[in-house]
């Protein structure tokens, strides 16, 4: 239920960028509007992820997921009924506010039900849900628009799916083991690394004491945040802008341009899963060395982009698949790794705090991208993404070094 819910959240987020080429021709929206709306979305999303993380450490995770899915479904359907640019801004902002509270409950569930020595692979499986949702969104949206001839169907269909899944989630998602009369996961799994983290997490601290000592003044958290912001800049550029670039510059059809994003997400699905398993089994929960290997592969891939973009669709699709594979390794490992370096009871808070800065990074792939494009064309956008990837790699190298000390 957690897996499908997370996939549906992404389905109702990425349908907007998938529908954008059609909306640019069928409505009065401009590329500048898209950039501004994207930045607003990511800022609001990050802020609400922070708030949601704080809330979920105190309440039942199931009390958030189902109602939020229902709300997101309603907003998407209303978006399809709208025609004014002002309404688009308002509804997309409301979608961001609701979507921002989507992941912290899932992070809390993962931290509560899976121990440290297995968390990498299980987290990777849940993280794969957004690759599936992100992969299906451009295809489902493109076919819905192509079948109906209107961009509106690209919001009606995902909205209806979200409504249905929200009702299912109300009955299927469970709270933490302790509330169901079960032992904590470290005892049940007999995991010494999990028990050590529990032992190092005092139980009589206030929320503020935990936040200050284990998050705000934790240097490892800040290095993770810098790396995560950078990977979000790169991910958002590679996820939100190629369909516009290929449709406008190379004249690709909507389905063809959006299919590149599906290949990117399909590669990300495999990369995230493999990174989780490697970090658990081969690298003994060392998330950072695992992530560094993936980041180095991503550096190689991004350098190859200018060499294949004007050749063939097949080569472009292959490269985007490999880039997705390489990028989603660090993307997933930053998320699970931050749980390993903080208080056991702060899973929601650290996820929300990290998410606040992650989506500042995502917002930096909105308006700043259109500013870079207007000044230095698409080659400037490419260099911007390259710099973000290099910063991600440096952050992982530093974390890997500190892990060995």
List PLM regions with ranges:
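Cytoplasmic helix-loop-helix junction between adjacent transmembrane helices
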Residues: 91-132
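A late C-terminal transmembrane helix in Major Facilitator Superfamily
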Residues: 344-375
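Residue-level signature of mid-helix packing/kink "hotspots" within the transmembrane helices
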Residues: 14, 42-50, 134-135, 265-273, ...
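Cytoplasmic membrane-interface "Motif A"-like loop-to-helix N-cap segments
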Residues: 58-69, 281-295
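Conserved MFS/SLC helix-loop-helix module at the cytosolic interface between two early adjacent transmembrane helices
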Residues: 47-83
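Extracytoplasmic gate region of multi-pass secondary transporters
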Residues: 16-20, 218-273, 331, 365
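Helix-loop-helix hairpin linking two adjacent transmembrane segments in secondary transporters
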Residues: 126-178
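C-terminal ends and interior cores of transmembrane alpha-helices
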Residues: 70-83, 296-310
